[in-house]
From Swiss-Prot:
The lineage of its organism: Viruses, Riboviria, Pararnavirae, Artverviricota, Revtraviricetes. It holds the Pfam family Vif. This is Virion infectivity factor. GO terms for cellular component: host cell cytoplasm; host cell plasma membrane; membrane; virion component. Vif-defective viruses show catastrophic failure in reverse transcription due to APOBEC-induced mutations that initiate a DNA base repair pathway and compromise the structural integrity of the ssDNA. In the absence of Vif, the virion is morphologically abnormal. Residues 75-114 are annotated as: RNA-binding. Homomultimer; in vitro and presumably in vivo. Interacts with viral RNA and Pr55Gag precursor; these interactions mediate Vif incorporation into the virion. Interacts with the viral reverse transcriptase. Forms cullin-5-RING E3 ubiquitin-protein ligase complex (ECS complex) by interacting with host CUL5, RBX2, elongin BC complex (ELOB and ELOC) and CBFB/CBF-beta. Within the ECS complex, Vif interacts directly with host CUL5, ELOC and APOBEC (APOBEC3F and APOBEC3G) substrates. The keyword Phosphoprotein applies. It is a peripheral membrane protein. Its main location: host cell. Residues 40-44 are annotated as: Interaction with host APOBEC3G. Residues 176-186 have a biased composition (Basic residues). Residues 151-180 are annotated as: SOCS box-like. Induction: Expressed late during infection in a Rev-dependent manner.
Length: 192
């Protein structure tokens, strides 16, 4: 019988970013208790040798599984040391891969308080509203003018440590164009 290949999207991520993300997940699971129902699977609990960890996030009758890998082939740059992240949405026997932005939105639908557009209606009706959104990563668009006006009145409280964002985990911070210093800056960068 020949080998059967399964292709999946794995986002290349440096190991320090993965370590930070894992510790944020564990902090909010065990200390702050904001990630209720989340399940963390260690590398030694997996049968796959390249799986570094898995985080299972229940979303109603479905779940989001964020798998971190190690020992993959290195990427284009030296610092891509074979670390990666796959994001999968599962419901019963069906599963599909999702991008980091959608993963954050799905998490935000089920977890963490939000100062959402429904707060505008409640504020107009005189009801008390939640003063802030705890999970800004779950929003990918600019709100309405009313929403922006109300949000400007209330300064968001910084959560320490921040909530774990899948989009932030997979963000490519290495391949952004570098800004060189001006004339008084580094002379090796501008050729003088």
């Amino acid at each position: 019988m020949e080998n059967r290949w399964q292709v999946m999207i794995v986002w290349q991520v440096d190991r320090m970013r993965i370590r930070t993300w894992k510790s944020l997940v564990k902090h909010h699971m065990y200390i702050s208790k904001k990630a209720k129902g989340w399940f963390y699977r260690h590398h030694y609990e997996s049968t796959h040798p390249r799986v570094s960890s898995e985080v299972h996030i229940p979303l109603g009758d479905a779940k989001l599984v964020i798998t971190t890998y190690w020992g993959l082939h290195t990427g284009e740059r030296e610092w891509h040391l074979g670390q990666g992240v796959a994001i999968e949405w599962r419901k019963k026997k069906y599963s599909t891969q999702v991008d980091p932005g959608l993963a954050d939105q799905l998490i935000h639908l089920h977890y963490f308080d939000c100062f959402s557009e429904s707060a505008i209606k409640n504020a107009i009706l005189g009801y008390r509203v939640s003063p802030r959104c705890e999970y800004q990563a779950g929003h990918n668009k600019v709100g309405s003018l009313q929403y922006l006006a109300l949000a400007a009145l209330i300064t968001p409280k910084k959560t320490k440590p921040p909530l774990p964002s899948v989009k932030k985990l997979t963000e490519d911070r290495w391949n952004k164009p570098q800004k060189t210093k001006g004339h008084r800056g580094s002379h090796t960068m501008n050729g003088h």
